[in-house]
Amino acid sequence: MAAEPSPARAGAVALAPRVPGATYRLQLHQGFTFDDARRLVPYLDALGVTDLYASPYLRARPGSPHGYDIVDHGALNPEIGTAADHAALCAALEARGMGQILDVVPNHMGISHGQNRWWRDVLENGPGAAYADFFDIDWDPVKRELANRVLLPILADQYGQVLESGELVLTLEGGGFQVRYHDRVLPVSPESATDILAYRLDALAGTLAEGHPDLLEYQSILTGLRNLPARTETAPERVAERTREAEVLRRRLARLLEESEPVRLSVEETVRVLNGKRGDPRSFDLLDRLLDRQVYRLAYWRVAADEVNYRRFFDINELAALRMERPAVFRETHRLILRFVEEGKVTGLRVDHPDGLHDPARYFLALQQARLEQLSAVGGSSPAFEGGPDRERTGVEGTLVASPAGDVPAAAGVWPLYVLAEKVLGRGERMPTRWAIHGTTGYEFLATVGGLFVDPAGARPLTATYRAFTGLRTLYPDVVYASKQLILDVALSSELAVLGRALARLAERHRHSRDFTLRGLIHALREVIACFPLYRTYIDGTETTVELQDRACVEVAVAFAKRRNPATSASIFDFVKNVLLLRDPDSADEPYRQEQRAFVRKFQQVTAPVTAKGLEDTAFYRYNRLVSLNEVGSDPDRFGVSVEEFHQACATRQARWAAGLSATSTHDTKRSEDVRARISVLSELPTAWRSAVGRWHRLNQRHLTVVDGQAAPDRNDEYLLYQTLVGAWPLDPTPEGALAGFADRIQAYLTKATREAKVHTSWVSPNAEYDAAIRTFVARLLEPAPGNRFLLDFAAFHEPIARLGMLGSLAQTLLKICAPGVPDFYQGTELWNLCLVDPDNRGPVDFEARTRILAELSSRLAGEERVALAKDLLTRWRDGHMKLYLIHQALQYRRRRLALFREGEYVPLAVAGSRDEHVCAFARRRDTEAALVVVPRLCARLTEGGRGLPLGDAVWSDTVLALEGHFEATTYRELFTGASVESVPMEGGGRGLRLGALLADFPVALLEPSAGSRS
């Protein structure tokens, strides 16, 4: 069945955005191309997906597994396919009425291997480069030796050692010189090329007769290079002159080298001499002097944290941040993307890491403005953008864009382009209302729906077990604080230093703050950032007031920083707070205000990566109480979500962000939805878990290794390992089955986890002995030997966990499909998916098997009763066909009732009876249409610890779903089994549906009123 026709196609311009019905994320790379995706379109359509959700596919560095290291925003990635391949994929989607959401990367670009011509221009021409303003570079850093230069921390050893080992090689290619370092290629600046060309000039003059045309041309080229505008000249006309003349001289030299053998031999000999001779350190002096004249300063990679002077994506040296707030940068990076939008090939955008942008709100407005201009060009108009006085500047080329009235988020149809933000919301944080988007990528939904299956009663006993087993008593907020401080010290200290110097300049401008020292200000900033409760604020430097949420965030951070630093004067923290909240001193002039606002913008761009690295990539691997909570968008300190809290979140979502994605697994999640569902079961079985981990430690302590006088792995890492095994244990744990490669996966995962934790080993300073101890411990635990008592014990413990995890997975999947929002599926998760963090979750997916299974299910649906099919699938639940069946049936139903699920009212349904706390139920209602959703939760107590299934009256007893006058029908049809369920009178009046009847043969239910049935 084809999806609803796409309104945004070439020749048929839409006035409103296409909002997906359901999305499916595909990871495109050289191993999975446009052609591979095109072949999947019929399967995705049959599954019920309406929109393909594609990872970035613009030209990235060669071999990129993810596409986030784009080197050319104006071209497709040739490893993924040609323009014709891309067009064929888009045509296949269009033929079935499907849309495409493209993941776009505005924050940064890949710069590692010389393919990025913008970055190459910067390395060649410095501040005088045509693209110098495209990147966020501090041309006036603290270290004076780096003035008007870029630190390149790419060397594997100290610079002198690398130079004298002959690893830096000068080459002549065409009319230009380059420096090669293994697979990296760096340009030689035009003015410094004079050192090379002049080195043997006298010898060349002796070879060629005076007045020889080749010699005259050679000397003319030298003169031209010497007279180029300096690379520090940044006036546009001088930049253009330098660029133009340098290219002319390069071509002239290339032609001369090709035509004159004496010139070519002379230059080649110079290159040979400059490259030195290993074993003779002085022979590298000339090359050293040449390198010292370059825009870039080559350095050992370890110095990056302290001295790098270009903004990066987090602490990744190979990803340089873009200045997306500049009109030219926006225009050049979005030309191809917006062309795809205009042609209808792309119907929505997912914006990666908007928290890294200078001003996310203005960026999103610029996207909508660009789409509006496309619509206006063909005579269209969007009601949300019709004229009137209420208009707001985007800051991009001075264009104007109208805003929706009031402080209300945009609903579907308000903004002309469907846009999603990859925004991780902190606990209690609300989306910025000024963002011209339709929602997020769904991490807040992931946290809410996942928490519904965590038993709050397990918090105290699991905390006690964790502390007793590991000996750790540090509270989670303290773990986060220490982790963020560590990141500021070892990964992002250069960013902190830049902020500190900017704040010191600001302090010097006023008599009330000039006595604060640079050291004191850096310390205060470090503490405030470490105490920051959210990823970042969104204070607009063009306004004089700060929104309530931003103000509260700053005030909380400063208050906690004061509390943690009683020996530090409160006045310095108050100064930081006043600067961040735009509270100017009485005598502040306009230059002060401009500098203050520039500082605030920079500060906001630093807190986000510090939080991401400190929280997601450090604290989440240090605090292992219940690791299903250690997930992007989740809070490990929030132990469970009540049914009432879930309903409130869904109601808010329907009112504000009904077009946002509802995700349960993504390419960035630490664990798949099915892994988390299993681990969350431990919250229901704290006593059994405490006994099990104690027993396993005693069985496995003989496999520990002594490293630096301590047992390895330590107790915290061991505790993480056991939870990981609970979550990822194969469905076929036999030596011939999945267990064969399982040990390798767990070894790789635990190595990554312990390095991310940065306690005993790290990526920056790997501890080879500890890493080896981890691998040995895992290998011995999982060795399929007859005498391995641990495996036998673990398998027995895990059997009911797997069954209970299955129930949680099915329940959260149905909730995702039916709750407010757009259900999003990560590739492969329509069957059981027991993957861990990347790269484990980015492996190949067996789509042939999934296509075959879906066809078999469709065939069986046509030939047998639903109830028989449902019972059979439940009996053999381990093969995952049951999950695919649920997804297929629910998505198809959702597509048939799209208006109901997109616009319908969200109605929480009450449950009465002795098992009421084990049910989450709601209805979606629109006019005469309605659908009821019922799922079980916390099923361990219902099933004797997972030994059975929560089906029938024997389990549900007197529990009834109260209809409470919401619905007049007396009979309801259940989608998965086809059963008809009659309502019954309830004590105290009203009618209800018995849970034992709703969940008689299948563990979740999706119902609709039967036509013509009325009470």
Q: Which residue stretches match the model-derived regions?
A:
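Carbohydrate-interacting/catalytic domains
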Residues: 1-62, 74, 79, 87, ...
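Aromatic- and acidic-residue-enriched segments that line the glycan-binding/catalytic groove
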Residues: 64-72, 108-138, 369, 430-443, ...
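C-terminal EAL-domain catalytic cores of bacterial cyclic di-GMP phosphodiesterases
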Residues: 83-105
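Conserved short loop/turn motifs at secondary-structure junctions
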Residues: 107, 351-357, 875-876
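Alpha-helical transmembrane segments and their helix-helix packing motifs
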Residues: 111, 467-471, 500-501
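Short, glycine/charge-rich beta-strand/loop segments that flank catalytic centers
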Residues: 104-111, 907-908
